[in-house]
Amino acid sequence: MTHTAALAPVLAEHIAAVNAFDEDAIAATFADDALVNDAHREFWGTEAIRRWAARELVGDRVTVAVTEVLDHYGDTIVRGCYDGDYDKTNLPDELILTNYFTVRDGKIVSLFVIRNTPASY
């Protein structure tokens, strides 16, 4: 079942760390063997995730303004308005990305970042 939810503490810490451009704090929110999938690319483990965060979040000074939080059978779906110094060619003025988080034992074990488009039916 899907319903509106509050951010779990680790997810609030994660968003705050992204907005603070703090790669150490970002990496600390993930389990050692976590998976991030961003733009159809996989990053496994905290060291790979740290490199991804350093280059693509901190390096591009990405910020996230959360617009919606949903619980879906224990996973958390977070939609947010993204901004930063990244290449915005062919992107909408307001970039909304959907983050699909799985949290276990107080750590993020998976994060999938998706730019969804509305279904035509």
Q: What is the predicted role of each segment?
A:
Residues 1-3, 50-121:
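A beta-strand edge to alpha-helix "cap/lid" segment located at domain peripheries
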Residues 24, 32, 109:
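Glycine-centered loop/turn positions within well-structured domains
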Residues 42-52:
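Short beta-edge strand/loop motif at the mouth of beta-sheet-based domains
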